[in-house]
Amino acid sequence: TKVFHDHERHATQYLTTAGVLAVSSNTGSIQIGELLSHDTFYDYLTKFGVGSKTGSGLPGESRGILPKVADWSGTSAPTMAFGQGYSLTAMQATSIFATIANDGVRVSPTVIAGTRDASGNFTPAPGRTSQRVISAETAKAMRLMMESVVSGNGTAPSAAIAGYRVAGKTGTAQRIDDTCGCYRGYTASFIGFAPADNPAYVISVTIQDPKGLHWGGALGGPVFKKVMSFVLQSRHIAPTGTTFDPIPLNKKALAAKKAQDATANN
């Protein structure tokens, strides 16, 4: 029997789905994953591009590793629910976030937008494909929950940008050392997009085998903030002017919100 825990031991938590994302709960992710059959879970992974090349045209691009359902062990589904048991490239991971930012439609990435000849005529890059992966409503709900990650109660408050709504997710993964075939060190990451309510850019930060502090939010968040701040300013992307209405992250906050809403409706 395999017992799963969150990375940091804690008292029992009663989290909402947004709370599971905000605090990066492994056990919460497992419980959400259990709502899906293995085939459905695998189908969503493949639709998001896991296990296949992105179509970017980058030379040497890897497909990553996604085992077939028939090859899963008893622990595959739970570990895959929180991001272990398969591998993907930074381009693949960023493409997943771009799909959520793009209202659930996955568009194959391209290294260049196109070419312009001596006369100034622009020719778009060929071969881009698109596929709906999730509904626009689901994508919007995901974006709202991912804003909680960047809140003061999430794992990446250091990714917040003053005046802008930011959404994202941290990653702190055990790192495979090919020399021993064992886990050694960590891969810290943060991928996010802004403005969260009208996404314009997605930025991915990955730090391999950091020494000392190894949390994705603490390491990747500040880098994301600097890069995204520059991009938004240099591309003249103005703040949307809207504010983020915090989503309850746990049972107590959810009950309080329901009581507040009931009072407002009376």
Show the residue positions of the predicted features.
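Low-complexity, flexible helical/coil segments
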Residues: 25, 56-58, 69, 230, ...
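Conserved catalytic/cofactor-binding microenvironments
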Residues: 235-259
